[in-house]
Amino acid sequence: ADPSATVGRFRVNVASNRAGRTALADTVAYVAQGADPYAVIRACVAAGARRNGIATVDRRPLPEALSGFGWCTWDSLGRDVSEAAIIEKMEEFRAKGVPVSWVMIDDGWSRTDREAETLIGLDADPERFPRGLSHTVDLLRERYGVRHVGVWAAFQGYWSGLEPNGQAVARIGAEHLTVTSNGCLIPGPSRWQAMMFWATWLSLLRDMGIDCVKIDSQSSMSTMTRGVESYGEATIERHAALDRLVETEMGGAMINCMGMAPESYWHRPVSAVTRTSDDFLPHDPASLAEHLLQNAYCSLVMRELYRCDWDMFWTSHPHARTHALMRALSAGPVYCSDAAGRTDPAVLGPLLLSDGRVPRPDTAAVPVPSALLADPTCAESAWCVTATCGDWRLLAFVGMNPDQPQRIRLHEALRGLPACAGGGERWVVDREAMTAERLRPGADEGSAGPLLAYGESRLYYVWDGSWDAAVMPLGLIDKIVAPATVAVGADDDSGIGTGDQLSDSEAMAVRLAEPGRFALLDPDARCVDVRCNGETVPVHRNGALCMADCDDTRVDIRWKA
């Protein structure tokens, strides 16, 4: 029997996964107590990471290969992926002006026995990729400007392992493999065995031009080896080998997928990205709530270790805009899986810059304190997640109740979050209404906002910083993560200089990520001039929110002292 212990109302069950083991001696859990729920989670995760010798998120930067906008073949083509079908989709992206930075060729590309679900060879299926995978990669890069191309693989080789008499086994060497109790041939548990498996395959993929990978089915390993290998034996060396080799061969550009079991996420030393949910289910719109809840609540822990992948989405979908909003707030890879003819550039516009770069928050969005222990599918208030971007806080509300609309409540969502720096008043910008509202401390917290039906969403920006200046740059307001599109300070001498500042005014220079509609918060109506590349531009004022169309990236703001 698996050992267990109960302390008060807290019960811990411990299992080894290996038959015959009757005693365990190790740290099984970390517990922290405090007023800040995010801080106590962070403390526990940091302790666990130190104990296991793995990096926390601050030492796992998002790989450059996955930082732009991507497209994955899975929900578009499934296992019927081919070079011809990929090129058809790329033609659509080019015609619609969608800048795709990376392409992930998912399950179906490799040489497999589809009935036995085993891996035959380490190369591409010759019928689907008749001129080889490298030809497809070259087309994507040279004809369509795709910068990075990745492929899918399973942690165990393929769903049921490797074909015993296949070319893959001959190339890797049978001595580097092991047979499970039900006859599946998989990479062996020692680091040397796992390294030989992945070194052989990743090296071949690099020769084909592949520079990122998605490794699926990771938490299946302990199930496949149940009774024979403990959780640690099933995962520690296999993950260590994979992580280090992907870091060496591909700069760490890997999506860890279906690896949300503790034996997986506690044993990856350095890889940066992990999926935080089950698959996006595009044909079942009712799955929205479950998908978002999985991602947001799992991110409470995962964002302390990894860059969170909230999975692909469709831009033509009943809840496309809400899915896009949530992917923007994931702080991880952002990619769609649209089928041919189904991409809606209008949904992608707020997510991306014109060159395919993706503005991101500092960390993945998580539920606000008031939502941590509530069931959002039946609550009166709309569900809310929060993420930060510099001194701005983003609040995204989503209707989660399929039976009735839910009310946006800003004061409730902010309760328990850190106060505005310096104890000042909060200002909230409603992105949809393009208005700004002052939230005074002690104001009526019963005041309510709009209603959201199931799948509807609304985004707010909250200034959490100090009031060192009269105006607060928000950024390109047409982009979801607007604060990530502006930086205070400019790197040249254009615009306002000391010679043309008035004695009774002050000024600030900012740099935009690209030209566009720039927004700033001006609570006391002190802004007197906005210049783009030295030229004064018209400013549209809606209360405390000011907006100006800028055709350059250098912007200078001047206000009354």
Regions found by a protein language model. Give the residues of each.
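Solvent-exposed beta-strand/loop surfaces of large extracellular or lumenal domains
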Residues: E425-E445, R531-C546
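Aromatic-lined carbohydrate-binding/catalytic grooves of carbohydrate-active enzymes
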Residues: E64-E229
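Carbohydrate-binding surface patches
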Residues: R327-S330, Y335, A374-A421, G455-A470, ...
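Carbohydrate-recognition beta-sandwich/jelly-roll modules
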Residues: A1-W102, I120-E127, R143, H148, ...
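C-terminal beta-strand-rich structural cap/linker in extracellular carbohydrate-active enzymes
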Residues: G442-I480, R541-A561
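Glycan-recognition surfaces
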Residues: L162-S203, D207, A240-P345, V366-P367, ...
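Flexible loop/turn segments at secondary-structure boundaries
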Residues: L77-V81, S110-R114, Q156-L162, S220-M224, ...
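Active-site-proximal helices and loops of the catalytic beta/alpha 8
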Residues: G132-Q156, S230-F280, V347-V366
